[in-house]
Amino acid sequence: MSHAPRYAELRCKSCFSFLEGASHPEELVGRAAELGLSGLALADVNGLYGIVRAHAEAKRQGLPLIVGAELVVAGLAPGRPARLVLLAQDREGYAGLCRLVTRAHCGEGWTGAPPRRERDAVAVPFEAVAAGARGLFALYPGADGDAVARLKDAFGRRAALAVARHRVAGEEARVLAARSAGRRLGVPVAVTNDVHTHARARQVLQDVLTCVRHGTTVDRAGRRLFPNAERTLKGPEELARLWSDFPEGLAAAADIADQCRFRMEEIRGEHPLPPVVVERGGLAGGVEVATSSPAQAARDGARSTTPSLRLRASLPAEPPAAPAPEAPAAAAAPGLAASAASVAADTGADRDGALAGMALLRELVREGARWRYGGEPPEDVARQLARELDLVESLGYASYFLTVWDVVRFARSRGILCQGRGSAANSAVCYVLGITSIDPVRMGLLFERFISAERGEPPDIDVDFEHERREEVLQYVYQRYGRDRAGMVCEVITYRGKSALRDVGKALGLSLGQVDRLAKLVGSYEDLGQVGPELLAQAGLDAADSERVRMTLALARELQGFPRHLSIHVGGFVITRRPLCETVPIEPAAMPGRTIVQWDKDDLAELDLLKVDLLGLGMLTALSRALALLARHRPAPASPTPVPHPDALATIPAEDPEVYEMLGRADSIGVFQVESRAQMSLAPRLRPRNFYDLVISVAIIRPGPIQGGMIHPYLRRRDGKEQVRYPYAPLEPVLARTLGVPLFQEQAMRLAVIAAGFTPGEADELRRVMTHRRSHEKLAAMKARLVAGMAERGISGADAEEIFKQLLGFAGYGFPESHAASFALLVYASAWLKRYHPAAFACALLNSQPMGFYAPHTLVEDAKRHGVEVRGVDVGCSGWESSLEGAAPGRPAAPGEAAVLRVGLHAIRGLPRAVGEAILEARAAGPFGSVAELVRRARLSRAWLVRLAEAGALGTLAPDRRGAVWRSLAVEADGGDLFAGLAPPEPEAALPEASAADEVSADFTTTGLSVRGHPMALVRPGLGGDRIRTARELGRLPDRAPVEVAGLVIVRQRPETARGIVFVSLEDETGIANLVVMPDVYERFRPVVRGAPFLLARGRVERSGKVVNVRVDSVAPLALAPSMDARARDFH
């Protein structure tokens, strides 16, 4: 009986060789283990994008994974660039591989932000490869003698030729040529299979990917397609038969694999952040920051080229933003006034007398605690701070905290609103450093949710910044640390239903019309399995009659989840002590000025690599703008609503009953986190009365509590309709504040500790399983451990099942309590502004778009319902942004005068900011006396003048919109001379007067909003009397009453947790009506529900207390509605 030879596949591409490989890394690793390979080298083209995923699977399978990449190399062989596989033999070789991949994407000696290259243009010169050859093994799939000689000179015994047999014409000649060159030059020849798939069945999809890459169809691709499915993973037995004449080629492959001993586990937790140091004597003030580059340090004679920050430090000048009642009133933040003796005694003082590492962190925490608590902190806080600092020191995370502190310090020094959130708000250290705004000790938050020595993973601090000013913060990080040591985390954009259908359909040769009809059948995220014969028939397609349509659907399902391209993560930054490009390749992002690493956040987490999340939050921008507006337009001195300092959210008056009463009425359009349909339905039932109620409100409308069946029990208990009970008596201290119902991740962790005997570290591992995507199977596998632990404590039967069900719900994502509390601060601040300063709040929201749940026209209608006068855009009064003015158009409000909201020029669709600024610059010299004067002074072209006229922005100069448009058409194209002072060359036509509906339609088409009135008010007289109810009237109808409603569609939602139910919000002149469209109704009326801007809906009233919905039986487009470009916001 013969034994299969040892064999390792050295040349394997995954789907992260974008549009080349047709299998996921995990599929390749799993298949390699199944086939009994002794190792597998993942070598994607110009990247290490999929290596961490492969590594995670290889650990599970016990398969040696060789780290490699297939580089496109210029200058190795004659003609066009050649492919060269490089495999890492050791850590030094891995660093060199990352540098070479970075060089391929970024070019030589790149500084600043290198320009992005198309993937087909990415290449690295062979000279760079030769210079970085140490620790790398080169595998060349060619036979050119000169190229082989150059490889041998550069790599010596670490070079080999690769040969493959795919049963195609001409390949035997290539195999013989390679073997001949190898013998002649003393270079080994190894058998590989140039793997593109893990199974032969995936070859059809690989053909489609090839067509997508080349922009062709399978009918026209010709030789671009592989002639068969032989480029798949093969086992040793099959290869031994295929290469019976050359067994030494298989042995050579196994030998090369044995030489490549580097494993990804070697970089786990590697590279702490650069040290931050503060000069002795610089602790008492200033924010001056100085740092030396490695080159400068070398010139100064420094022995290390590791950059460090040498700061003159101060805490943020902003007091803590905490309207919660337990938050103390804070004094102004002091500087750090450390004595020289205390600094010198600390072991963290370096030889130059500067504070660094733990010494600096401890000193910052000491002074920060005095700042937060107005003196020495309470004993429980001091104990918690000491415990946290000891753990930070033992785990070596001081630089991480100091780096985040420095970034926050920079933002505050520039007047940028920011606030930490997420699990970091569980940390008292983060609170006293000014990173977060929630006092975790007073709120009883669980620190282990943030850092745990038991689980041994790095902390994760998320900081939100004003989204319009976040770029300043990002560029500060690049500048401070250098682009070779700082990069943004990537996000892998994958194929979804619609994009998969489009690409596959085009590749299979479907007509553009067929592709469009197919793509319109699904939303971007819908499961293609829902596309059945009925939907195909609606689109005029028949799968039974069209093999290509059937194949398109089948292949698109396979393609879903494949990587399509890289994007930028919402805010993750990796910052390292040694060059980042020695840990992970860097490449330019599509956005100018950004560079990204080739791994996403899950890859970094898998390897325990630190990242800092610097996120943009639109509400912080809106709050900053609103506070600035109030500072400029202060109410009268006698006003009962004081204006807070524009940089200090903490000075907003706390615990105002009027604010809670407003939120309890679901009057929350524009308010952070509580403006969705679900939150507005919850509000009348929850009736928030204090800050902690807002914390619960933020957390409860989440997939975790919804899927765990926790919302209704909590509300019933809150209303006294259900007795508060605990499935296990010792859980009462954990669940008492939420009436026996777990709503937060921290509660789920404590529940596992108390009810099942988990250690805190095990409980956090459970939390990780619960919140990780694809976690349901893992959580179900832990049920035995949970049930056994509960049984030991006498919990069984229904109680045990209830606890497990609640835990299982958190696999659908639940909020940590600290995160909900951080967001609740912004809920309160935005609600206070809406309640007492609706004009400033609405103005700030308009100027911060795009953000939030509603389009500008809904924000304007809501402002009008709150008594705000809104005036339209006008070249004589509007700024670029929307603004506040007084009773006199274009002039500030006088003391005691109500502010009026003026829509800005930015609202005009398609109008460039440069054109708007030119108008404002010209107007600064004096008001415009006529349209002709406007054109002359602002140098407006005909196109922009016409756009202004269409938008009604010439109202103060030409009140009649149609006449203004007519006159604007007479302007010379270059904005120069006018015909007879804007009179047309022929007598002006007698234009009919525009109707009110025409005016509103024109407003929506050009600006997306109208200040003249709601379109429904214009069409209601034609709807047939009182038969069609207004949104306001719905509240007076009894439960299950038949009803018809009509309105403008402002929001469509189809949440994953709703099991196919679609929620539609209709707006009319009185408010908003919420429609519930069940799956069967949606399927019958899908095109109307998804596409009609105005709807007429018939159904029945559904009442639950003060919450009123309409359960829809049928819908139709509203025929009488004016034709306008009204855009709803769709959420899937």
From Swiss-Prot:
Q: Which CDD domains match?
A: DnaE_OBF (cd04485), PHP_PolIIIA_DnaE2 (cd07434)
Q: Which SUPFAM superfamilies match?
A: PHP domain-like (SSF89550)
Catalyses which reaction? DNA(n) + a 2'-deoxyribonucleoside 5'-triphosphate = DNA(n+1) + diphosphate
Q: What is its EC number?
A: 2.7.7.7
Q: Which GO terms describe its cellular component?
A: cytoplasm
Alphabetically, the GO molecular function entries are: 3'-5' exonuclease activity; DNA-directed DNA polymerase activity; nucleic acid binding
What would be one Pfam family of this protein? HHH_6
Any single GO BP term: DNA replication
Major location category of this protein: cytoplasm
Q: Where in the cell is it found?
A: Cytoplasm
The UniProt keyword set, sorted, is: Cytoplasm, DNA damage, DNA repair, DNA replication, DNA-directed DNA polymerase, Nucleotidyltransferase, Transferase
Xref: InterPro entries:
DNA_pol3_alpha_NTPase_dom (IPR011708), DNA_pol3_alpha_thumb_dom (IPR041931), DNA_pol3_finger (IPR040982), DnaE2 (IPR023073), DnaE2/DnaE/PolC (IPR004805), DNAPol_HHH (IPR029460), NA-bd_OB_tRNA (IPR004365), PHP_dom (IPR004013)
* UniProt similarity note: Belongs to the DNA polymerase type-C family. DnaE2 subfamily.
Functional description taken from the UniProt entry: DNA polymerase involved in damage-induced mutagenesis and translesion synthesis (TLS). It is not the major replicative DNA polymerase.
Alphabetized HAMAP family for the sequence: DNApol_error_prone
Q: What is this protein called?
A: Error-prone DNA polymerase
Source organism lineage? Bacteria, Pseudomonadati, Myxococcota, Myxococcia, Myxococcales
